[in-house]
């Protein structure tokens, strides 16, 4: 009896697979025919949509973003003259302080093992404000960038490209604007001579500018479409992503080819670089045994909190300002061993 049921089940399953494959192929053919007919209408609609941009009501928002971004870069560059920032030599870990922590979270680029101690080197402003670049489009209705055309277009900061499409920057002046405002010239002697009250004021201004930039980018993304690759986090500011085959270049990445585009968010254009945050009740050097006690914070927030600036309440759940600290009796291990 069981053999008869087995044969009947095989016949039914084979019939179901055959009917399903025939139906799917027929549906795919109908979809391709429909797309060929709709292609001229879609292209015409894209061209007509470009006439509605830039939206005049959104231009002041883009201008406020540029002003806040300029203040943010200058204030962070000034704070880095006083407060040291360290970055790991083998991974992207960042720490705000004179001495790096001893938390074993290094997943190095080279094959030296996971969950090891970090090897700290001096950091820069790019470790605090993570640079995110995208291709600069001549206009919003231009064709998709092909792989062989990837060197014909300039790479600019994604925020500037978003503000350029919003009408705050002229397309031909965006490269010059980036060179002037992204490299502020600040004297180290003038910053070190500032009293503690002025440093607190600089930190508060940096936090305020950071929040303004993120809030403004969130508003612009509601009007101007942007894409991000799900796999490699490549950002493209425009209605459709480019076709430069820059995704999956490593051997362990099996997809190797075009990007997998999805809608971009604020964290894709203005990423929060999360770091371990040392609180006043914590030891001088954070150890691996107390990692469950310590808090996290965006690198900018951690840097500005060292100046005494008031941190927004929304970061309190991650920073654990009133949380318990880990107490240990063993000496700190030597890094040289």
UniProtKB/Swiss-Prot annotation:
Keyword set includes Cytoplasm: no
Q: What exactly does this protein do?
A: May be involved in the stable assembly of several 4Fe-4S cluster-containing complexes of mitochondria.
In terms of Pfam families, this protein maps to: APO_RNA-bind (PF05634)
Here the transit peptide covers 1-20
Q: What is its main location?
A: mitochondrion
State what protein this is by name.
APO protein 4, mitochondrial
Compartment(s) of residence: Mitochondrion
Know anything about its domains from the record? The APO motifs may provide ligands for 4Fe-4S centers.
Origin: domain of life: Eukaryota
MF annotations from Gene Ontology: RNA binding
**Ranges for domain APO:** 87-172, 228-313
The question of whether Aminoacyl-tRNA synthetase is a record keyword is answered with no
Record's signal peptide: none
């Amino acid at each position: 009896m069981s053999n008869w049921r087995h044969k009947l089940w095989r016949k039914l399953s084979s019939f179901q697979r055959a009917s399903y494959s025939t139906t799917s192929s027929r549906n795919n053919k109908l979809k391709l025919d429909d797309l060929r007919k709709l292609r001229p209408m879609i292209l015409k609609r894209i061209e007509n949509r470009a006439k509605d941009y830039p939206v005049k009501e959104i231009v002041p928002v883009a201008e406020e973003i540029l002003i806040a971004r300029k203040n943010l870069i200058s204030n962070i560059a000034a704070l880095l003259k006083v407060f040291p920032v360290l970055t790991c030599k083998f991974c992207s870990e960042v720490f705000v302080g004179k001495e790096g922590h001893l938390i074993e979270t290094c997943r190095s680029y080279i094959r030296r093992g996971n969950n090891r101690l970090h090897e700290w080197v001096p950091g820069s402003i790019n470790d605090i404000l993570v640079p995110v670049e995208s291709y600069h489009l001549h206009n919003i209705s231009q064709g998709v960038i092909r792989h062989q055309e990837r060197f014909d277009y300039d790479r600019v900061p994604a925020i500037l490209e978003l503000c350029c499409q919003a009408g705050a920057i002229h397309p031909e002046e965006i490269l010059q604007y980036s060179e002037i405002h992204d490299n502020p010239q600040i004297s180290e002697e003038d910053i070190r001579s500032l009293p503690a009250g002025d440093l607190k004021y600089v930190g508060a201004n940096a936090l305020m500018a950071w929040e303004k930039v993120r809030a403004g980018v969130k508003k612009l993304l509601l009007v101007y479409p942007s894409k991000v690759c799900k796999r490699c986090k490549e950002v493209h500011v425009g209605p459709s992503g480019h076709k430069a085959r820059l995704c999956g270049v490593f051997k362990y990445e099996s997809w190797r080819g075009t990007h997998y585009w999805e809608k971009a968010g604020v964290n894709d254009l203005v990423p929060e670089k999360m770091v371990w945050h040392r609180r006043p009740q914590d030891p001088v050097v954070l150890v691996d045994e107390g990692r469950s006690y310590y808090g996290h914070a965006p690198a900018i927030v951690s840097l500005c909190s060292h100046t005494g600036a008031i941190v927004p309440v929304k970061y309190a759940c991650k920073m654990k300002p009133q949380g318990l600290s880990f107490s240990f009796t063993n000496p700190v291990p030597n890094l040289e061993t």
